[in-house]
């Protein structure tokens, strides 16, 4: 991945995780397409490529073939997304990675349950642990169970939900962002984190996802200058932008609003999805047009790089699939176009 693929590489020489996260979102999107009823082998081919790239030594933190890695260690962030990709590949009909899929899944269970707070360590020597990442880990285990017929996700899910309800609820009822309390914002619900958490919870705990989604809309859904989005921080809390949030404009978070499209699709909220999509389309079209303009193109790349477009792709294909299946979705159609 180059700086033309991922905006963050223009700011940080060796960022962690944006490459595997982009591949994970792509894999989810192509799984959505494969389950839409379209008779084509293209989705599986695309997910297969995502697996290949995810295992590549330039993406995986071990810098060598995983079969030659004796212990997977505490690379929870990479492994949560790799396991998601492997789950999507298996559910799309792919074979050949069963041993790796089983190994990664069992390791994620181990490093989750060995912690008193039920949150696996995400990066060696980094204390911070986001609740959304543990939800992603459990979702990846749920995908594994769907493919392999097991029940690995149940205990990590029960332990995590119990811990969050007892220890990590903000006064709004929303879950806090970071559970080790090592950041100023740790006890705050953040938009980018909440949207991801809700999306991942929708698989293994749909009722919890809908409950948090309702609170998320109540406290952080906001309209500014005619555009609908989601706040990165609660009104009144002074927090800045960072690589996770992307730009925060007039209170609205770029990452929070983009990821909220996934959360809306995953919870079947077509009205909010279409509201966000309608607001995003002219902004994305403008950003695409500015990619050729020096200096200004740095801003446009935030919304048009591989991570951003993969998130949009995953959200749009998710909602389109639910509409086709008639699962609590109106008959209104959403375009598959990313812009």
What do the PLM-derived regions correspond to, one by one?
Residues 54, 58, 112-115, 164-168, ...:
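Alpha-helical junction/boundary sensor with strong preference for TPR arrays
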């Amino acid at each position: 991945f180059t700086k033309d693929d991922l905006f963050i590489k223009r700011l940080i020489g060796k960022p962690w995780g944006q490459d595997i996260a982009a591949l994970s979102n792509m894999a989810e999107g192509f799984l959505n397409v494969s389950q839409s009823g379209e008779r084509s082998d293209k989705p599986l081919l695309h997910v297969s490529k995502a697996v290949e790239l995810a295992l590549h030594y330039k993406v995986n933190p071990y810098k060598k073939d995983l079969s030659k890695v004796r212990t997977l260690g505490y690379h929870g962030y990479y492994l949560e997304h790799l396991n998601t990709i492997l789950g999507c590949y298996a559910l799309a009909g792919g074979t050949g990675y069963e041993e790796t899929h089983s190994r990664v899944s069992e390791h994620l269970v181990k490093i989750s349950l060995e912690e008193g707070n039920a949150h696996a360590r995400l990066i060696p020597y980094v204390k911070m642990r986001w609740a959304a990442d543990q939800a992603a880990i459990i979702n990846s285990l749920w995908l594994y169970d769907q493919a392999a017929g097991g029940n690995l996700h149940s205990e990590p899910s029960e332990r995590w939900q119990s811990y969050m309800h007892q220890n990590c609820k903000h006064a709004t009822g929303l879950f806090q962002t970071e559970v080790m309390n090592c950041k100023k914002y740790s006890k705050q619900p953040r938009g980018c984190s909440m949207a991801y958490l809700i999306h991942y919870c929708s698989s293994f705990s749909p009722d919890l996802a809908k409950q948090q989604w309702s609170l998320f809309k109540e406290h952080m859904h906001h309209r500014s200058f005619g555009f609908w989005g989601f706040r990165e921080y609660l009104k009144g809390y002074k927090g800045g932008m960072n690589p996770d949030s992307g730009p925060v404009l007039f209170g609205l978070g770029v990452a929070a609003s983009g990821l909220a499209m996934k959360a809306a699709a995953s919870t079947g909220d077509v009205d909010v999805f279409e509201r966000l999509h309608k607001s995003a389309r002219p902004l994305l079209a403008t950003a695409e047009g500015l990619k050729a303009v020096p200096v200004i193109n740095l801003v446009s790349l935030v919304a048009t790089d591989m991570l951003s477009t993969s998130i949009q792709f995953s959200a749009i294909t998710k909602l389109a699939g639910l509409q086709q299946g008639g699962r609590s979705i109106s008959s209104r159609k959403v375009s598959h176009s990313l812009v």
